């Protein structure tokens, strides 16, 4: 668009159009102009509880004191399994109902969460589940993004909404919630992004994911396991869904005790290994770059843009469904609970 046309468009819209960024991104504008609303004193609640259709697993290590994701799910009243190594079972059982804890048959393998993730996959298959959720253990709270604004979400109904959306299509191998920092308020962000990486809060289709097993294992390697699995599914012609309508706020992996920090991210030198491992697994779409004095992997997802969703017949509803969610008052007590940090009571 030339400068004259841009100026004419800005006059019609009665607002400035932000310049396009270095990656071709544009934050966009709202027309009519959207006034910035403040929702800091509100949260999403629900008039009724809609539990997830599929089990939620949380592989965890060394975080029985913080147990952030567990706290969130407890507060929202949703069942889950905390998956732990045997030497830490008693620590977790002192703070979590033992009926919610699954004890792994191994410990300290030095492979991060990979063995636990593969055990979880097999467990869900043995229990006859078509899909399962697998969540990182450092999720602080959930959010819903609607009309360009993120609001904290105090209902588990977003899991059911995501499940139902994924069920509209026959070939969605992975779906999940994006990180809240990647869906900025008032920027033009699609509610769902197709065919990209999904991590930290994932709904896995067991049957479809089984198409990409490597030596009988779903998860592999030591680093970047979520991105690796996303790429393997995409290379198999399957699709992934990343929700911007539903988001998670996480604690920083490197700043929290426990988890895979000691086994996988134990020092800065590991950063290059972390980046190079994905480039070795997927050299056709990955390169290693240095940003902000740290090594990163950079993945090109454009080759998978042609992976088309296959709709299931007669499954898309004809009317909107808010899954019983509504904007509610965010009380000081609720706010305190949502921001509960490591070791809080």
Protein language model regions, located:
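C-terminal catalytic/acceptor-binding lobe
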Residues: 1-55, 63-65, 220-345
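Conserved catalytic core of nucleotide-sugar-dependent glycosyltransferases
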Residues: 141-231, 235
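Short, hydrophobic beta-strand segments that form beta-sheet elements in well-ordered domains
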Residues: 56-60, 79-86
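Short, aromatic/basic amphipathic alpha-helical patches
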Residues: 69-75, 91-98, 190, 274, ...
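Short, acidic, metal-binding catalytic loop of nucleotide-sugar glycosyltransferases
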Residues: 45-51, 63-80, 95
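Active-site-proximal specificity loops/subdomain of glycosyltransferases
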Residues: 84-135, 140-154
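A structural signal for short, well-ordered beta-strand segments and their strand-loop junctions
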Residues: 82, 131-135, 173-178, 240-244, ...
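Short, polar loop motifs at secondary-structure junctions
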Residues: 62-63, 84-90, 207-208
């Amino acid at each position: 668009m030339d400068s004259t046309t841009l100026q004419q468009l800005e006059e019609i819209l009665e607002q400035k159009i932000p310049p396009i960024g270095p990656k071709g991104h544009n934050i966009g504008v709202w027309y009519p102009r959207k006034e910035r609303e403040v929702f800091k004193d509100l949260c999403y609640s629900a008039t009724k509880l809609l539990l997830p259709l599929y089990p939620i697993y949380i592989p965890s290590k060394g975080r029985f004191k913080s147990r952030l994701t567990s706290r969130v799910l407890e507060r929202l009243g949703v069942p889950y399994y905390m998956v732990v190594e045997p030497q830490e079972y008693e620590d977790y059982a002192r703070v979590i109902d033992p009926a919610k804890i699954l004890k792994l048959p191994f410990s300290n393998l030095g492979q991060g969460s990979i063995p636990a993730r593969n055990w979880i996959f097999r467990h869900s298959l043995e229990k006859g589940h078509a899909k399962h959720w697998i969540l990182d253990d450092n999720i602080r709270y959930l959010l819903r993004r609607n009309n360009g604004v993120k609001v904290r979400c105090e209902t588990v109904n977003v899991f059911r909404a995501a499940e139902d959306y994924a069920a509209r299509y026959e070939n969605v191998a992975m779906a999940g919630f994006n990180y809240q920092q990647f869906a900025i308020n008032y920027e033009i962000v699609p509610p769902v992004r197709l065919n990209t990486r999904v991590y930290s809060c994932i709904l896995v289709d067991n049957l479809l994911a089984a198409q990409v097993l490597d030596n009988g294992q779903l998860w592999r390697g030591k680093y970047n396991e979520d991105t690796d699995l996303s790429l393997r599914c995409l290379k198999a012609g399957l699709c992934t869904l990343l929700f911007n309508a539903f988001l998670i706020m996480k604690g920083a992996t490197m700043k929290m005790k426990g988890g895979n920090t000691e086994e996988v991210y134990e020092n800065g030198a590991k950063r290059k290994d972390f980046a190079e491992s994905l480039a070795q697994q997927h050299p056709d779409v990955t390169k290693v770059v240095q940003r902000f004095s740290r090594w990163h992997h950079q993945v090109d997802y454009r080759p998978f843009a042609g992976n088309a969703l296959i709709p299931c017949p007669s499954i898309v509803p004809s009317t909107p469904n808010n899954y019983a969610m509504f904007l509610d008052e965010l009380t000081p007590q609720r706010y305190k609970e949502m921001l509960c940090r490591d070791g809080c009571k």
